Amino acid sequence: VLRKTIQEQESPELYTNLPGTDTLLPHYLKLLIPQYGKTILIKHLIHFQTNASYAYENLETLHQIIPLCFSAGINYIPFYYYSKLSRNDRPNLLYPFYIITEKYVLQLASDLSKGILHSDPAILQEYTKEFQNCLEHSSPLLQQSKNLDEALQLYMTSFDTIQDITSLDATPCDSDFMDNEYFFDRVKEHSPEYAPFMNAYKSFLNVINQANRNDFFTINGFQKYCEYGISSGTSSIVIPKFSPEERITSLKYFLEHFSNENHHMLNSTFSYPDSLYIELRNNHSLFLINLADKANISFIIIQESSICNAFSEFFQLLADSEYITPENQTRTLIQKYIQQLKQLTFGITP
């Protein structure tokens, strides 16, 4: 059904209520999308657990669907509703899952091992109509964008309500490396096309600086910045590469404002991709940003309570874990790189 839909339709669409925890849909999309070079629209109706004992299923769902959001060739729009049904209840349900396309409805058994295929236009019309009704009684799971300008606008939404921010990135936050004016000067120099955003971004940064912040970054990402001038997050969009002089200035600023209560360097045993940025605001808004370069950005906002609570608990555990580099070691490493960069730039020996 998937192959025929992608192969035959100019703008293929697919509607489904397959379990969010199941790997079936991501697996076949990964195989088929590259073969045909088309973009498929997928609307996915997912049930989320209300029972806290099964909340891990909600996280499993997130684990399966986020790669779909980040994938080229897939316009993936998930919706959710709450249900007390668990996977233990599925064997008692009669063909509870379905896939709807322009030409087919495929009903699937609870274990997805067998199905009933319909091609009658009347059945297709009825299923499509009822699916739309279901969407009206559900909620979008996330907001997303793959357009840089739109992503920046979304990122700065409702920033005046921010009180607490916890983030995880490969490198420290821009505002930890430099004050606002220094950042804006670098933007004007390296990427003047983003100057129109700077007034709004300045107001945003002022709020960020007043919030209670808890930032995690990796030692591998930090070393990459110090040695090659390659940052992550917003600065990597507008400042392609920091010069040795800029790195010295930013590291001095970071060392001066460093606090082990708010800044946590994760040691080399913590594996984390350079392109991913995670931010939790006020414990009820989760931002996931995958930024390969200016042309390849995936931006997601999730405001579902069980997922946000799970990330809040994760960050609390991470702060007290064996992954945290002690403050004295972090300061020593920063000072070491300042001296190395001075020697490289000005010929100053330690």
What function would you assign to each model-found segment?
Residues 349-350:
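PLP-dependent class I/II
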Residues 329-332:
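Short, charged alpha-helical segments
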Residues 1-324, 337, 342:
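Hydrophobic protein-protein interaction segments
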